[in-house]
Amino acid sequence: MQVKKLTDLDVRGKKVFIRADLNVPQDEAGNITEDTRIRASIPSIQYCLDNGAAVMVTSHLGRPTEGEVGPDDTLAPVAVRLGQLLHKPVKLIANWVEGGFEVKPGEVVLLENCRCNKGEKKDNEELAKKMAALCDVYVNDAFGTAHRAEATTHGIARFAPVSCAGILMGAEIDALSKALHQPARPLVAIVGGAKVSTKLTILKTLADKVDQLIVGGGIANTFLLAAGKRIGESLAEPEMVREAQQVMDIMKSRGAEVPLPIDVVVADEVSALARANRISVDEVGPHDRILDFGPKTSAKLADIIAHAGTIVWNGPVGVFEHAQFAGGTKMMASAIAHSEAFSIAGGGDTLAAIAKFHIADDVGYISTGGGAFLEFLEGKKLPAIAALEARYEG
């Protein structure tokens, strides 16, 4: 994937429009409760300021009604936090599409919630052209919305004088390309989660590429059903057994493997007080629920991870929120942390597991995109990246 990079451009004296992802959670009083996305946007903004650009930043926040900015929709709290992180005032500009505001080189303003503009979500061409007219350089630094074709992620990239990837977006593209397009072998993928149905496309796409496909959570239970194992009252999708079998067949035909659990942790309910039992996968009773990998399985999978060249991780392998069902995910996380392989991880639950087991510094790259990360794994073209690719030459 070839795109122009912000750091390759001379932005001195230029008006730069940055589409960031500042969609952060807030409490009922409007206080930001978690600011990772704002922090992740700082390098591109700082680069432009340090190099004498006049900087405009915008983002979506929540799911507002187009044409209105309600009290829950405003980026005002984000402007305050951005100012604190940049150590300079950040003015919030409302009704900005037609221009009429001034930004000097070395200054930064925040343009109010872009999803409040009529036509944003439908990638309206007239809106995109008006926004493109505000700038000399358009920067997309919002990988989390790269799978959506909207006016600030796609349309503007077509019409701005120059369109490029920001520092965060560039790092995402480089890391994902390294993991999936030129991986060091063996390539090991870990796909956890409740349902095969929601990740079927990913599983089939990866089955054509990876050397080992580790499945966890409810997905693993469906694969166990496909392998003829009894799973008691475990979460699974019996209607997806044929699809699970197809994934295993694709892997087998390539000489690759889906290593299924040999022992599991079971209980009769999912709760913090549930009594956990470690048993062989062949001993699962009619009322048992499989809630985690057992220690033998975890050790076997940790060995696979230890010998990997590249690791792609999406989804925990057990109900890791409860300590007695966290062993599999914890051992997996530890194996990834100690592996020499290049590792990339993404998806909300995966990030929660990384935080819980304190391995953020030991994962090669942590993707900021939930849906965008999944669609990339599915092999789909992401509209925002496709728009930047189309502008690579001009």
Swiss-Prot record:
What residues bind substrate, as annotated?
A: D21, L22, N23, R37, H60, L61, G62, R63, R115, R148
EC number(s) for this protein?
Answer: 2.7.2.3
> Which residues does ATP bind?
K199, E321, G347, G348, D349, T350
**EC category:** transferase
Give the UniProt keywords, A-Z.
ATP-binding, Cytoplasm, Glycolysis, Kinase, Nucleotide-binding, Transferase
Record-level Gene Ontology MF annotations: ADP binding; ATP binding; phosphoglycerate kinase activity
State whether it acts alone or in a complex, and with which partners, per the record.
Monomer.
This one is known as Phosphoglycerate kinase
Give the organism, scientific name.
Azoarcus sp. (strain BH72)
